[in-house]
Amino acid sequence: MKGFFVTGTDTGVGKTFIACGLAALLKEQHVDVGVFKPFLSGELASDPQSDTALLKNMSETPLTDEEVTPFIFKEPLAPYTAAKLEGRTVGLEDAVNHWKKIKDRHECFIVEGAGGIAVPLGEDYFVSDLIKALDLPAVIVARPNLGTINHTYLTAQYAKQMGIRVIGIVINGISSRPGLDEQTNPDMIERFCGVPLLGVTPKLEDASPTQIHHMIKDHVDVSLIMNQMQMGAEK
């Protein structure tokens, strides 16, 4: 099947905005797209402001909250830590089994992780292991400012070492008046990471669905993502 996994260099880099905008744009291009965010911490999926609600809204999937996000934890912590505090255990096979139940409901899926690529989801597995288990390529979302070259390079190299195909990188949240760091980091990241720079997206003051949609449409090369997905599906 077609699809990709949106991961990040850290928490709070804008994975949900990027995933939502890509879902909306693919939908606009008549792609039957679904969304899957298996782990959610510190929010209720039914909350209209939750990541799950935004993903469902912008993809227009008929999947239920529970199908999109089967594992929800009260505390805003790494899923493994949050689950331990509740006396719960979620194994990799549990996440994969939920995926198998929905993966044929849409032609294409956008899956969003939790935090960065090495965040622990369970006792013996990380986000990277989930990406591998779902057999999807990855889109990495990175921040634009000082220090991001190091974090993005480490994320991309780790993904490659894990055998994860990286479609490209989106640098999200660049300011309206970027300093030298934000001006120079995109070129350095593309050069050193050795994967395509899919786009550099602005910091949104109004993160409404419409603004998110236009941000992706104006600043991200979605055709490159589609081509990379097609190449992967044909292998």
Swiss-Prot record:
Which parts of the sequence bind Mg(2+)?
T16, D51, E112
Q: Where is it located?
A: Cytoplasm
Q: Which UniProt keywords apply?
A: ATP-binding, Biotin biosynthesis, Cytoplasm, Ligase, Magnesium, Metal-binding, Nucleotide-binding
Q: Which parts of the sequence bind substrate?
A: S41
Binding positions for ATP per the UniProt entry: G12, V13, G14, K15, T16, F17, D51, E112, G113, A114, G115, P202, K203, L204
- Annotated metabolic or biological route of this protein: Cofactor biosynthesis; biotin biosynthesis; biotin from 7,8-diaminononanoate: step 1/2
Q: Which Gene3D superfamilies match?
A: P-loop containing nucleotide triphosphate hydrolases (3.40.50.300)
Q: Name one Pfam family in it.
A: AAA_26
Relate the protein's function as given in its record.
Catalyzes a mechanistically unusual reaction, the ATP-dependent insertion of CO2 between the N7 and N8 nitrogen atoms of 7,8-diaminopelargonic acid (DAPA, also called 7,8-diammoniononanoate) to form a ureido ring.
Q: What is this protein called?
A: ATP-dependent dethiobiotin synthetase BioD
Enzyme Commission code(s) on record: 6.3.3.3
Protein family according to the UniProt entry: Belongs to the dethiobiotin synthetase family.
Query: Needs which cofactor?
Result: Mg(2+)
Give this protein's Gene Ontology molecular function annotations.
ATP binding; dethiobiotin synthase activity; magnesium ion binding
EC top class, in one word? Answer: ligase
The family database entries (InterPro entries) matched by this protein are listed as: DTB_synth_BioD (IPR004472), P-loop_NTPase (IPR027417)
First-listed, main subcellular location of the protein, grouped into a coarse class: cytoplasm
Q: Which residues form the active site?
A: K37
Q: Which HAMAP family match?
A: BioD
